[in-house]
């Protein structure tokens, strides 16, 4: 058996790390899609007034986010990738919209486990989701609720 040269050992080590990173990236992409899907379904349930279902979907998204964040701790380049942060933003948006519609306190970034930038983007997008709620309340002639939202 031939012993690899120092350069060969270094190259093998790099290849193993890159392969691990690629696998982690693939898992993060898939999990990010699932989180985004759950968050979108939570927002839809919120619009339909199905707050218990919205909460259930949101909880599942948040649980997946916790697991994903733990898995990505050793891979900051993947954690900070746009597709991971976008998934976190979508989950935060669903949580913010649900909180406002359900008359609950507005959750903070730390409550949701998201970075500040993702939270601020979620806050802006939740405002556009609330536009639909306002229009629905206006159609129902519920001016007080529309004004509140």
Q: Residue ranges of each PLM-predicted region?
A:
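Leu/Val/Ala/Ile-rich N-terminal alpha-helices, chiefly Sec-type signal peptides and the beginnings
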Residues: 2-72
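Short charge-dense sequence patches
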Residues: 4-16, 40-41, 75-83, 98-108, ...
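Amphipathic, well-ordered alpha-helical segments in soluble domains
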Residues: 10, 31-34, 38, 64, ...
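Non-transmembrane, amphipathic alpha-helical segments
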Residues: 20-31, 43-46, 50-53, 76-86, ...
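Long, charged all-alpha helical bundle/coiled-coil segments in cytosolic proteins
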Residues: 57-113
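Long, charge-patterned amphipathic alpha-helical coiled-coil/hairpin "stalk" segments used as oligomerization
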Residues: 95-140, 144-149
